């Protein structure tokens, strides 16, 4: 069924910034998608087009991206009479019309909004759930429920505290199914809230952009200690492991790293990549840390390679790879990491997201699907993670509706699959392994 009409508008994300929403109409109805936005943006990612009109929304308006959809992309797609199940053809057409390497003409936020809406319409056209349509597009016969990685302590660019490292996550790998993983996550979260309140006072339980707590601690080890205590108090020491997103590019300073980057600058406290690697290894030794994302700067290739070879855990590339097939191929060649963080808006289309995922999986990597810090009520990534069988998703703490929207959709998918539902559990790094 071809597209009858496409209409885009400015809506608001969870930080009160404008973002793009797309309504796509076929004879089967209306299909709506909204685009997320990140706080820490990699320099190699597809361009999110903002108006830069300082008199409006501090320059963050997206009326140009909206206009590109309404005036250029929409008429082209409607006139071509393409079937909404032809995801790759439609995405390719938009990318060719844009004609730039990083989607800077229309904006990745324009192309992605349409791409997501097309995917949702394609599922209904085929009469299958969205996760099944995505599995078909990716060539997967199975679907798998992921382990959720709940970001429960926030630091870095996401929080107003002194903590350098951006995310401290809990992964309930010992759960029997996704519903139990949610329960464990929620119970640990509430225990953590009490632990933080007792130790730092009630105002320390205010939440950050992704629903995690942002207590004013400086030592990253203290963050891990709080998690360990909360997991123990909840009674899940044998079922929960820890993940971190360091976002080290945010505190990379002339070849070194500043773990107190939110204080006045003082080069004498910078540490070398090797010292930082040793710090991570002490975390791995003393705590159940099984996954570290962006441990080094996006161009500190040597440090990545050395760490991945010796750490023995999941090393996730986000700023390093920005979901870009060229960067992924380089990281595969250099053995820089062993897991891809998949963010649809970093590459800017459904087709390219699927290609990036397949490329990573074909090279033996894990893949973790991710939200952005500026989110909407859109739940596309919940279906995406199930259809791509990646086995792991991070979409914030079990708090704030834009985060829960994704987790609740995963609960519904598990319920719909019934006895056929498979949960990644402890195999979250390679859930398709027999």
Curated annotation (Swiss-Prot):
Gene: ENO1
PANTHER family the UniProt entry points to: ALPHA-ENOLASE, ENOLASE
Enzyme nomenclature, EC number: 4.2.1.11
Protein name: Alpha-enolase
Catalytic activity line of the entry: (2R)-2-phosphoglycerate = phosphoenolpyruvate + H2O
Pfam families per the UniProt record, alphabetical: Enolase_C, Enolase_N
Organism: Pongo abelii (Sumatran orangutan)
Residues the record lists as N6-(2-hydroxyisobutyryl)lysine modifications: 228, 281
Modified residues annotated as N6-succinyllysine in this record: 60, 89, 228, 420
PTM info: ISGylated.
GO molecular function: magnesium ion binding; phosphopyruvate hydratase activity
High-level lineage: Eukaryota, Metazoa, Chordata, Craniata, Vertebrata
N-acetylserine: modified positions: 2
N6-malonyllysine: residues bearing it: 233, 420
Listed cofactors: Mg(2+)
Cofactor binding description: Binds two Mg(2+) per subunit. Required for catalysis and for stabilizing the dimer.
Top-level taxon in the UniProt lineage: Eukaryota
Gene Ontology cellular-component annotations: phosphopyruvate hydratase complex; plasma membrane
Entry binding sites for Mg(2+) 1: 40
Family matches, as InterPro entries: Enolase, Enolase-like_C_sf, Enolase-like_N, Enolase_C, Enolase_N
Subunit record text: Mammalian enolase is composed of 3 isozyme subunits, alpha, beta and gamma, which can form homodimers or heterodimers which are cell-type and development-specific. ENO1 interacts with PLG in the neuronal plasma membrane and promotes its activation. The C-terminal lysine is required for this binding. Interacts with ENO4 and PGAM2. Interacts with CMTM6.
Modified residues (N6-acetyllysine): 5, 60, 64, 71, 89, 92, 126, 193, 199, 202, 228, 233, 256, 281, 285, 335, 343, 406, 420
Subcellular localization: Cytoplasm; Cell membrane
Residue sites binding Mg(2+) 2 per the record: 245, 293, 318
Positions of region (Required for interaction with PLG): 405-434
GO biological process: canonical glycolysis
Active site: 210 (proton donor), 343 (proton acceptor)
């Amino acid at each position: 069924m071809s597209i009858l009409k496409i209409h885009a508008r400015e809506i608001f994300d969870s930080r009160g910034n404008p973002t793009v929403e797309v309504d796509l109409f076929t004879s089967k109805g209306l299909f709506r998608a909204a685009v997320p936005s990140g706080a820490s943006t990699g320099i190699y990612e597809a361009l999110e087009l903002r108006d830069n009109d300082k008199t409006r929304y501090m320059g963050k308006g997206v009326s140009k991206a909206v206009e590109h959809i309404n005036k250029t992309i929409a008429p082209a797609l409607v006139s071509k009479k393409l079937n909404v199940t032809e995801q790759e053809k439609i995405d390719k057409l938009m990318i060719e019309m844009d004609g730039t390497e990083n989607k800077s003409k229309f904006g990745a936020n324009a192309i992605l909004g349409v791409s997501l809406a097309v995917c949702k319409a394609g599922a209904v056209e085929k009469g299958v759930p969205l996760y099944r349509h995505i599995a078909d597009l990716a060539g997967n016969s199975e679907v798998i429920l992921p382990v959720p990685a709940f970001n429960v302590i926030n630091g870095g660019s996401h929080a107003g505290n002194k903590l350098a490292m951006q995310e401290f996550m809990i992964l309930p790998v010992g759960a029997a199914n996704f519903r139990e993983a949610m329960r464990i996550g929620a119970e640990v979260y509430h225990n953590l809230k009490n632990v933080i309140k007792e130790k730092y006072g009630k105002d320390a339980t205010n939440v950050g952009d992704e629903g995690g707590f942002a207590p004013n601690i400086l030592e990253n080890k203290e963050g891990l200690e709080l998690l360990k205590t909360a997991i123990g108090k909840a009674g899940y020491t044998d079922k929960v492991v820890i993940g971190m997103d360091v976002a080290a590019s945010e505190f990379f300073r002339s070849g070194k790293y500043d773990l107190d980057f939110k204080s006045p600058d003082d080069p004498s406290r910078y540490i070398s990549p090797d010292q930082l690697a040793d710090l991570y290894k002490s975390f791995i030794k003393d705590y159940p840390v099984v996954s570290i994302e962006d441990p080094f700067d996006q161009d500190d290739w040597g440090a990545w390679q050395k760490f991945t070879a010796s750490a023995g855990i999941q090393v996730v590339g986000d700023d390093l790879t920005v979901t870009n097939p060229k960067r992924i191929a380089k990281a595969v060649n250099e053995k820089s990491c062993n897991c891809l963080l998949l963010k649809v808006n970093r590459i800017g289309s459904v087709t390219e997201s699927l290609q990036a995922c397949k490329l990573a999986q074909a090279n033996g990597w894990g893949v973790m699907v991710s939200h952005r810090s500026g989110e909407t009520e859109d739940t596309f990534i919940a279906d995406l993670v199930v259809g791509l069988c990646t086995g792991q998703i991070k979409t914030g703490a079990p708090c704030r509706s834009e985060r829960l929207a994704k987790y609740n959709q995963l609960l519904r998918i598990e319920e719909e699959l019934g006895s056929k539902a498979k949960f990644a559990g402890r195999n979250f790094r390679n859930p398709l392994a027999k």
